[in-house]
């Protein structure tokens, strides 16, 4: 309880509050993820198969599973699938893996997906998270879009730790945002970064 926390801080030192973080987070949502299924955004025929699978968690992929020539089409396919398919009726947690922050695709991925279908997205999967500021950037963008578009659903963030930089900053990444719901370890990209 936040009010109890503040009261405890004040009781601890009545004259002044030595430290008070600007980050008062509610616990992130807990979602069932017994199994995950990655679906390339460039293959719409696979969306229906994913919907009818036994996977609890489906991530629609804009990153590694999509060739550079198909990125924009894949984004449009995912927006259409989010709007037209009722994933939640089948009990699916839906995530979209955007392109990493070091690409020119990431910005449009996040804006177009969330502005057009944000109420249908449970989480954004951030690849190659290297620092807490990477997560902070996505968090700030999500907040701005949600407020601007009056999106009711607060979208979570999941981070892929896939680089030596990300691993060395994992503690800071883990506590970087109240939206953060999960950390995933990307073994292949991590090994390549060493």
What are these regions (language model features)?
Residues 1-19:
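Short, Lys/Arg-enriched N-terminal segments with co-localized hydrophobic residues
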Residues 22, 27-194:
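Conserved alpha/beta-domain cores
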């Amino acid at each position: 309880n936040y009010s109890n926390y503040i009261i405890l801080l004040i009781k601890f030192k009545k004259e002044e509050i030595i430290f008070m973080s600007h980050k008062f987070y509610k616990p992130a949502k807990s979602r069932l993820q017994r199994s995950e299924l990655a679906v390339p955004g460039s293959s719409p025929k696979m969306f229906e198969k994913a919907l009818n699978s036994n996977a609890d968690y489906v991530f629609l992929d804009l990153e590694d599973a999509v060739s550079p020539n198909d990125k924009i089409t894949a984004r449009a396919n995912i927006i259409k699938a989010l709007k037209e398919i009722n994933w939640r009726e089948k009990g699916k947690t839906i995530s979209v893996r955007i392109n990493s922050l070091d690409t020119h695709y990431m910005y449009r991925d996040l804006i177009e997906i969330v502005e057009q279908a944000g109420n249908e997205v449970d989480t954004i999967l951030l690849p190659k998270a290297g620092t807490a500021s990477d997560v902070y950037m996505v968090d700030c963008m999500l907040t701005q879009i949600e407020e601007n578009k009056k999106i009711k659903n607060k979208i979570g963030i999941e981070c892929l730790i896939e680089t030596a930089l990300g691993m060395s900053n994992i503690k800071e990444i883990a506590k970087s945002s109240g939206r953060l719901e999960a950390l995933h370890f990307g073994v292949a990209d991590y090994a390549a970064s060493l």
